[in-house]
Regions:
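Alpha-helical transmembrane bundles and membrane-interface segments of multipass inner-membrane proteins
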Residues: 9-17, 21-201
Length: 201
C-alpha cells in the first residue's frame, strides 16, 4: 500500500520519492547506473544555443562588422574561421571536421559507457561534446566556423559558444581526472592494488 509519494513498510511510512538533484549530491554522490539521457539533452541544448547565436550573427552582422555587446569588455564581430578553436590550424576545414566527428563519437561513447561515473565528471564530457558538435555543424554545412565574441580588454582570438564549451569542458575534465576522480570515484583508480592488499591482509 502506498500513498502519494509514501510507501508503507512494517507499519511505518517511508518516502518513496528520490531526492531532487542538488549541488551537494552532484559533488558527493556517484551513480554508476545513472541515465546518460539528461546529459545528452543538455549537450543538445548547448548546441542549439550555439547555433542560434551564430544564426543571429549571420542575419544581423556583416562579415567583419562590429556590434557593441558588453561596453568596454566584449563586442560582437562576425568572423569566418576555417581553423580550429580560436583560429588555430586555419585552412584545414575538412580535416578538422573529420577530427571533430571522431572526437564527438568518442565523447558520446565515453558519456554513454560511463567513463566518468560521477555526475560532475559526466558534466565535463557533456561540455566537450556540445562544443565539438557545435563547430562540427558549421564545418560540415558552411565550410567555416562562425565566431563572434571579441574581447576588448586583451588581444585574443574571436570565439563562439562552442569554443567556450570546449575550453571549459577540457580544463574541467583534466582537473577532474587529475585531482577529483580518486575522491569522487574511489573505485576507478587503484582498485586492483586495494583488492590485493585486502587479500594479503
Amino acid at each position: 500500500m502506498s500513498g502519494k509519494g509514501l510507501l508503507l513498510k512494517g507499519g511505518i511510512w517511508y518516502n518513496d520519492k528520490k531526492p531532487a538533484p542538488c549541488l551537494g549530491r552532484l559533488l558527493s554522490e556517484e551513480d554508476p547506473e545513472e541515465n546518460p539521457m539528461p546529459y545528452a539533452l543538455l549537450a543538445a541544448a548547448l548546441v542549439a544555443v550555439d547555433q542560434l547565436v551564430k544564426y543571429l550573427v549571420l542575419q544581423n552582422i556583416p562579415l567583419g562588422g562590429h556590434v557593441p555587446f558588453i561596453p568596454h569588455l566584449v563586442e560582437l564581430t562576425y568572423v569566418q574561421n576555417t581553423g580550429a578553436a580560436f583560429a588555430l590550424f586555419e585552412e584545414h576545414t575538412w580535416l578538422l571536421a573529420l577530427v571533430s566527428l571522431a572526437m564527438s563519437v568518442v565523447l558520446v561513447v565515453a558519456l554513454w559507457k560511463g567513463f566518468f561515473r560521477h555526475p560532475l565528471g559526466r558534466l565535463t564530457l557533456t561540455l566537450l561534446l556540445a562544443g565539438a558538435v557545435g563547430n562540427l555543424i558549421d564545418r560540415a554545412f558552411r565550410g567555416f566556423v562562425v565566431d563572434m565574441f571579441n574581447l576588448l580588454f586583451m588581444n585574443f582570438a574571436v570565439f563562439n559558444v562552442a569554443d567556450i564549451c570546449v575550453v571549459v569542458g577540457g580544463i574541467s575534465a583534466g582537473l577532474y581526472y587529475l585531482f577529483l576522480a580518486d575522491k569522487l570515484e574511489p573505485g576507478r583508480k587503484g582498485s586492483g592494488e586495494h583488492d590485493d592488499a585486502e587479500a594479503a591482509g
